[in-house]
């Protein structure tokens, strides 16, 4: 009897940080993709920044959220990791239990990479979670007027047009490198997904790690950018979708993105609570002529999810499109059953 053939799971690497990454990862987990998440380590605000300063550990917040998005634990157990101490706890105020656990395990293991792998095993993570680098990074911004600032949490507050960002090591001026596992995942992927997330403070901090950025440029995988729905205060005022892509290409010195996903569903002006989501400005405008000059393929559709007075990418719709792309690009080979 002949062996039947089946299509293997697509190997998808998702690179970013912030709140956008978990939305896509949950969808990929539900579709049973072979997923690897590469998470930014340049955050220096909130609980992550405080622990980074006091305990000298890689910022934990984005890593925590990514681990939870791929975890098979019950929601009750996930809530424990997300619990934040209230303001009455003084020193612990604002810290989540998950961040404290990550900091403690990094100290115990002597390595943030090893700590994440152990925690992923404990949490039943379905996939791989890697920090973009195995050390905390400092994000620097150079603005159009030539002024500079360092620190991820400070960049948007300057409220000037950003010309360029780059990263340096927290301790000294040694060259920042990604781990071997990150580079192998990128080179072995069927698809590399960038975003969604803050352009200058969630996506580019990863790509500005020299060997990581070069791996994304060199990979034979389909490189997909998920364009943001809204512009962001202090980062992308007045940006069109093609402006987002142009910035990525200029930073890496090459047009490396193969496909851009763009939401075309209208966001009503009175829907978004701009007090609750104070980083939002207006919906990203479309420039399809500009996009066609930047990338070979643009996919525009309704990828919108209205929730809690805010607008988000619908993870299920986005992932359906990613899977269609993965199989249509002929990068998924047949494997024996």
For each predicted feature, which ranges?
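Gly/lys/ser-thr-rich phosphate-binding loops in alpha/beta enzymes
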Residues: 2-58
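Charged helix-capping and loop-helix junction motifs
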Residues: 206-213, 239-244
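Non-transmembrane, aqueous-exposed alpha-helical and coiled segments at domain scale
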Residues: 2-14, 29, 33-37, 124, ...
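Active-site gating loop/helix substructures
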Residues: 135-200
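C-terminal functional extensions of proteins
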Residues: 238-337
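Electropositive, gly/pro-rich neighborhoods at or near active sites that engage anionic ligands
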Residues: 42-161, 321-322, 328
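Short glycine/serine/threonine-rich phosphate/pyrophosphate-binding segments
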Residues: 20-25, 201-208
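A short helix->loop->beta-strand "cap" motif at the edges of active sites that frequently abuts
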Residues: 32-33, 219-223, 257, 295-296
């Amino acid at each position: 009897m002949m062996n039947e053939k089946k299509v293997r799971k697509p190997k998808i690497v998702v690179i970013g940080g912030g709140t956008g990454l978990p939305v896509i990862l949950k969808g990929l987990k539900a579709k049973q993709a072979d997923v690897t998440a590469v998470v930014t380590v340049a955050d220096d605000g909130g609980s992550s920044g405080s622990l980074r300063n006091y305990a000298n550990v890689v910022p934990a917040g984005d890593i925590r959220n990514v681990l939870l998005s791929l975890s098979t634990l019950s929601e009750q157990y996930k809530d424990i990791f997300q619990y934040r101490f209230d303001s009455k706890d003084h020193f612990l105020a604002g810290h989540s239990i998950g961040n404290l656990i990550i900091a403690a395990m990094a100290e115990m293991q002597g390595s943030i990479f090893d700590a994440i792998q152990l925690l992923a095993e404990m949490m039943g993570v379905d996939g791989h979670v890697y920090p973009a680098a195995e050390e905390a990074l400092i994000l620097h911004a150079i603005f159009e007027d030539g002024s500079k600032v360092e620190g991820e949490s400070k960049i948007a507050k300057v409220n000037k047009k950003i010309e360029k960002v780059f990263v340096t090591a927290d301790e000294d001026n040694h060259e920042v490198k990604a781990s071997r596992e990150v580079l192998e995942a990128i080179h072995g992927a069927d698809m590399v997904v960038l975003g969604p997330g803050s352009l200058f403070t969630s996506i580019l901090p990863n790509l500005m790690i020299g060997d990581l950025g070069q791996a994304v440029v060199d990979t034979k995988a389909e490189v997909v950018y998920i364009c943001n729905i809204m512009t962001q205060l202090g980062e992308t005022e007045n940006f069109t979708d093609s402006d987002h892509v142009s910035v990525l290409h200029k930073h890496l010195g090459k047009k490396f993105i193969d496909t851009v996903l763009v939401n075309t569903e209208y966001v009503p002006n009175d829907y978004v609570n701009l007090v609750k989501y104070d980083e939002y400005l207006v919906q990203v405008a479309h420039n399809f002529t500009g996009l066609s000059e930047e990338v070979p393929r643009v996919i525009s559709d309704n990828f919108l999810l209205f929730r809690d007075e805010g607008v988000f990418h619908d993870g299920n719709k986005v992932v359906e499109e990613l899977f269609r792309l993965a199989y249509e690009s002929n990068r998924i080979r047949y494997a024996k059953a």
